[in-house]
Regions:
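Short, low-complexity N-terminal intrinsically disordered segments enriched in polar/charged residues
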Residues: 18-63, 67
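Sec-dependent signal peptide recognition
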Residues: 2-8
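C-terminal motif of bacterial Sec signal peptides marking the signal peptidase cleavage site
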Residues: 13-16
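A mature extracytoplasmic/lumenal domain signature
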Residues: 69, 79, 133-135, 151, ...
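Low-complexity, intrinsically disordered terminal/linker segments enriched in charged
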Residues: 162-179
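A solvent-exposed, acidic/Ser-Thr-rich amphipathic alpha-helical stretch
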Residues: 64-127
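Exposed beta-sheet edge and beta->alpha loop/turn motif
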Residues: 125-160
Length: 179
């Protein structure tokens, strides 16, 4: 009889402990949900915008490729080079696609649209689209280059890209462009 009473008491204690844990967890969740997160997932439509831009670049449809850019857009490379303004970006990429790059393809693309609510450093608040893709470019001189590229796009309040930061290995491009 003592064994049965002991087992019943242990079971009751265990069940009561479980109920308390559940109550505390739900309190924590409700407090956490009311706090604005520093960053969160953004609308998947931004990934679709990015995917379409790569398709346009592959086709050489640079006018359609430029549709996503704001007039005040800035295009920056990790080397420190940059293009300022939609006109400068269009001029550079149209010339490059028409006269330097014979064909270009993007494979194994990864897209991550995020909404930055509280910047950690110098990045702007708002929607950022982070992307990674394997790029193969064939140049008009017959040489080819393949590398992984990481590109970050920032969208303004009307869903136009106002900042691009692209991380590339220029040494691979320069080598492929040499005769």
């Amino acid at each position: 009889m003592k064994k049965i009473a002991f087992i019943v008491i242990c079971a009751v204690l265990l069940l009561n402990c479980k109920k308390e844990d559940t109550k505390e967890t739900s309190k924590v969740v409700s407090i956490t949900d009311s706090i604005k997160k520093p960053a969160e997932f953004a609308d998947p439509k931004y990934a679709e915008i990015g995917k379409k831009s790569l398709v346009d670049m592959e086709k050489g449809d640079m006018d359609s490729w430029m549709d996503i850019y704001a007039d005040n857009a800035v295009y920056v490379w990790n080397s420190g080079d940059s293009l300022v303004g939609k006109a400068a970006i269009a001029s550079y990429w149209k010339q490059r696609r028409a006269n330097v790059i014979e064909s270009i393809s993007f494979k194994n693309t990864i897209w991550l649209p995020i909404l930055v609510n509280q910047p950690q450093s110098i990045e702007s608040k708002g929607v950022w689209l982070l992307s990674w893709y394997k790029t193969t470019a064939k140049y008009r001189n017959g040489n080819e280059m393949t590398q992984w590229i990481h590109t970050d796009y920032h969208f303004d309040s009307i869903d136009k890209v106002d900042r691009v930061i692209q991380y590339i290995d220029k040494a691979l491009i320069n080598k492929a462009m040499s005769k």
